[in-house]
Amino acid sequence: WSHSRLEELPALADSTWQPLPVREELPEETTVERAPTGDGTTLTISPLPSGGAHSLQEIYRENIASIVSIRGSKGDGMSLGTGVVMSEDGYIITNSHVIEGCGAVDVVLQDERVFQALLVGQDAQSDLAVLKIDCAGLTPAQFGDSTLLEVGDAVAAIGNPLGEELRGTMTDGIISA
């Protein structure tokens, strides 16, 4: 797409066109008015500490130890997914659909240790499940207050979308209305 092609579109021909600013030209801070977000349950990693934003690389390094793989056995097959360490004493959060219908569930830590998990509870509507493994000294993710999030806030997600086959992936985006 080029600027010269804008003239070919009547609706855009009379508009003022300017390139988007590059990163160095962006303001250091952007304010977005709070928008209604509904009353659903949300689980988030804590907001960045005051004093500046972290790079995606820093966020990754600070949180990758808290990301685990989930393996569930279902009849002749397996269910694979991601979990997040919630506490030092072995509580893990995952998606309910990952463990739904599984006879046994294993949690694989970043250091390759495998633990059989007990289901503490799950809620299909919010698609959340809490598991417990017999392991102490884990590195939990830092969870924050989701009521502090605003539309437009930057977020990042780290996970193992295919269990152990595709580990440690990361994506970023924004909170949308």
Please describe what each predicted stretch is.
Residues 2-177:
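Serine-dependent protease modules
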